[in-house]
Amino acid sequence: MALRQCAIYGKGGIGKSTTTQNLVSALAEMGKKVMIIGCDPKADSTRLILHAKAQNTIMEMAAEVGSVEDLELEDVLQIGYGGVRCAESGGPEPGVGCAGRGVITAINFLEEEGAYEEDLDFVFYDVLGDVVCGGFAMPIRENKAQEIYIVCSGEMMAMYAANNISKGIVKYAKSGSVRLAGLICNSRQTDREDELIIALADKLGTQMIHFVPRDNIVQRAEIRRMTVIEYDPTCKQANEYRTLANKVVNNKLFVVPTPVTMDELEELLMEFGIMDVEDETIIGKTAAEEAAATA
């Protein structure tokens, strides 16, 4: 099959790295050849695949030897569970320089050194937070990733981030082949969450490709620095990630999204009862003040 390059975006803390690594593990279990590139200075995009605290990053190693040109591919590329190839871009120390530059430098280095081998089926870019500008947009801005998956939940800020990321995709879709491939709902167990994300996906012109239920086994596996697929391959949650992997493999719905306004997003939340119908009299009032007013 032709190489498919996918970028995973979403609100910070939504579970992008965990979801990506479990998805990648499921793909590897299916026999797919996969490379995962962490595009986050935290360098936590490959730890579950490698059973490691954090992989040494390309930028760290480049600083140690002098420059990225002094590195060899085998220095930065590690092989983890299921033969998954792992690399972390890294970035400068906090408060110094532009971390986005690390993403650009790392991806260019991997390309030049032949990391994108012919036998690869998938490359996944696990990207910092919901940043879709500058260096962190490099996987979509430079047409590296054609498929964008957004990890979200039924929480307002996660949906807000998904909408913002969609705006970024629209911008870069005009000059390249990048497309939104779907929303992955990583459940936070909010009310009517699956219905809400399906409705949001519909407004964005895309699909909720899968609803990943919340299960504490994910955290138990993480404590052991393992994916659920490897830690307990017979559990229900492992099958959820396998289902997601199958849906990604067979996905054909790649769209230029249609972002909504903030008012439209709030209307959607009101429709599903997540946000109260707008009432100017409650703005800025504490719970105690509201209780006193209704007593």
UniProtKB/Swiss-Prot annotation:
Its EC number is 1.18.6.1. ATP binds at G10, K11, G12, G13, I14, G15, K16, S17. It is an enzyme of class 1 (oxidoreductase). InterPro entries: NifH/chlL_CS, NifH/frxC, Nitrogenase_Fe_NifH, P-loop_NTPase. The reversible ADP-ribosylation of Arg-101 inactivates the nitrogenase reductase and regulates nitrogenase activity. The modification ADP-ribosylarginine is found at R101. It comes from the Bacteria. [4Fe-4S] cluster binds at C98, C133. One of its GO terms (biological process) is nitrogen fixation. CDD domains: NifH. One of its GO terms (molecular function) is 4 iron, 4 sulfur cluster binding. Its cofactor is [4Fe-4S] cluster. It holds the Pfam family Fer4_NifH. The key enzymatic reactions in nitrogen fixation are catalyzed by the nitrogenase complex, which has 2 components: the iron protein and the molybdenum-iron protein. Homodimer. HAMAP family: NifH. Belongs to the NifH/BchL/ChlL family. This is Nitrogenase iron protein.
